[in-house]
Design a protein with these regions (language model features):
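N-terminal low-complexity or simple alpha-helical regulatory segments
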Residues: 1-129
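DNA-contacting interfaces and partner/effector-binding or oligomerization modules
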Residues: 114-164
């Protein structure tokens, strides 16, 4: 039996805020999608990642998954992470240690997440993948969230204006 990828509801809340700003009636849409209407009040609840991503893609209308993912990624904050993840990031002694903390703790936020860091010349390549939702129209939403997380972590060390 194939395992269902799960993600903490805290990471869904940014998408819900964007959709609400666009005028989407969230509660009814959540109910129709088989997702709990109490998602925003229960950030530690685990949700089906494919169902969540399908909901985002279906609810976004003309905006499209690409824009929704970007907008939700902009709303992501350190406070959305589990306390032990926050602590590991805030106490990391170096940029590489920050990336290692990200790799280690990411599975607690998203059970299907795959992350790795590979040396590439004098640089490092960070890989974030979402096995289990490759066929979803909303994969790009998860990719934006992952990109925002990595950029935010690098900016802790490289400065707020660093861009990939």
């Amino acid at each position: 039996m194939r395992r269902v990828p799960l993600v903490r509801a805290a990471h869904f809340n940014g998408y819900l805020a964007v959709l609400r700003d666009l005028g989407v009636p969230i509660w009814g849409a959540l109910r129709r999608a088989g997702l709990p209407a109490t998602t925003e009040e229960t950030p530690d609840l685990y949700l089906s990642l494919p169902r969540m991503m399908d909901f985002v893609a279906a609810s976004g209308g003309a905006r499209g998954a690409m824009e929704l993912g970007f907008l939700a990624g902009q709303r992501a904050t350190l406070e959305g992470l589990r306390p032990e993840f926050q602590c590991a990031i805030l106490n990391a002694p170096s940029g590489f240690a920050l990336l290692q903390a990200f790799l280690h703790h990411r599975k607690g936020e998203d059970t299907a997440a795959f992350s790795a860091v590979y040396p590439e010349g004098e640089s490092l390549r960070v890989v974030c993948d979402q096995p289990g939702i490759e066929d979803s129209d909303a994969l790009v939403c998860a990719e934006w969230m992952n990109l925002q997380a990595v950029v935010s972590i690098v900016r802790i060390v490289a400065g707020a204006t660093w861009t990939p």
